[in-house]
Amino acid sequence: MNEEKNYELWLDNYFFKPNFWQKCLAFILLPLSVLYAFFAILNTFFRKKIVFKKPVISVGNLSFGGNGKTPLCKAIAREFDGVFIVLRGYKRKSKGLFVVKNQNEILCTLTQSGDEAMEYAFEENIKGVIVSEDRVKGIEKAFELGAKIVVLDDAFSKFHIKKFDILLESKIKPYFNFTLPSGAYRLPKFYEKRADFIALEGRDFVRYSFVKENPKAVLVTAIAKPFRLYEHFIKARACYFFKDHYEFKKEELENLLKKHNCDTLMLTFKDFVKVKDFGFKCQIIELNIELKDSLREKIKTYIKEFEQ
C-alpha cells in the first residue's frame, strides 16, 4: 500500500514538481521523448477523415493524467439534451464495444465497463454510455441508439474523426514542455493549435469540490493527480493514494479503517463505483465543473450548425 502511494506521489512530483535528480532524469530520457514524439505525430496522419451528420464533441488534454475531463463531460451533459458518452474504457476487463448504459438503464458490469464509464452511467443527465477501442464504431452505435450529441472522453488525438475539440488546460501545468517520458505531454505542445477551443480553468470553467470534515473517515483515492484533492486531506483522519484505476480490495480497505479506528471511507465517485458492493459506509467527495458563458456559447454555436 505504501508502495502504491509512493509510486503515485513520485510520478506527480516528477511531472509537475521535480526535484534536482528528477530534472536530471528528465534530460537523460530526452532522446526517448524525441522518439516518442516522432511516432505520436506519425500516428496522427494517413487516416481518412470521418464526418458525422450530428454533433460530436471531444473533451481531451495534451498532458498525462486527469485534468478534469470526466466532470467537464458531465457538465456538458447537464447543459444539453440527448448526450451519449463514448470512451475507450481504460482498465476494463473486456474488449470490443459494450453499451454500458442506454436511456437510463445500466446494461453491464463494472469489470466490463471500467470505472470511468460506470461513473458516467450513474449520472442522471447522461442518456447513454458506450465503451469501445474503436471510437468510430462507438459513435455510430450511439447515434443508432438515439443520441442527439456524442461526447468523446479523451479523444483529442483521434484526428481522423471530424469533431469539435475542447482541450483542457488546468491551473497545474507540467514542469517541462516535453513529451513522455521526459515530460507529461502525450503529444507535442504545439498540437494545442489544432484544438477548436482551449478551455482554461477559471476563465472558461470553474472547478469546485465539497465534502464535510469527518474525523472518523479515511480518504482513499485512485485518481490521476490526487493532489487535486489537497484541500480535503485535512478533513479525514488519514489519506491513502493508489495508482489511477486501481482495483480496491475489500480486505485492504477494512485494514485501513481498523488501523485508524475509523468507520467511513471518504472517496470520489469514480472510486465509489468500485467499492459500493463492499458494504462500507462511504462519504463522497463531490467533484464538479461549471461551464462559463465563453465555453457554453461556443458549444451552442457548434451544435446549431447541425440544425440548419
From Swiss-Prot:
Record: residues binding ATP: 63-70
Swiss-Prot/TrEMBL keywords: ATP-binding, Kinase, Lipid A biosynthesis, Lipid biosynthesis, Lipid metabolism, Nucleotide-binding, Transferase
Annotated InterPro entries: LpxK
MF terms in GO: ATP binding; tetraacyldisaccharide 4'-kinase activity
Presence of the UniProt keyword Translocase in the record: no
EC number from the UniProt entry: 2.7.1.130
Catalytic function, reaction form: a lipid A disaccharide + ATP = a lipid IVA + ADP + H(+)
Organism domain of life: Bacteria
Any one biological process term the GO annotation gives: lipopolysaccharide core region biosynthetic process
Biological pathway: Glycolipid biosynthesis; lipid IV(A) biosynthesis; lipid IV(A) from (3R)-3-hydroxytetradecanoyl-[acyl-carrier-protein] and UDP-N-acetyl-alpha-D-glucosamine: step 6/6
A single Gene Ontology CC term: plasma membrane
Function noted in UniProt: Transfers the gamma-phosphate of ATP to the 4'-position of a tetraacyldisaccharide 1-phosphate intermediate (termed DS-1-P) to form tetraacyldisaccharide 1,4'-bis-phosphate (lipid IVA).
PANTHER family, alphabetized: TETRAACYLDISACCHARIDE 4'-KINASE (PTHR42724), TETRAACYLDISACCHARIDE 4'-KINASE, MITOCHONDRIAL-RELATED (PTHR42724:SF1)
Protein family: Belongs to the LpxK family.
Protein name: Tetraacyldisaccharide 4'-kinase
Source species taxonomy: Bacteria, Pseudomonadati, Campylobacterota, Epsilonproteobacteria, Campylobacterales
Name of the coding gene: lpxK
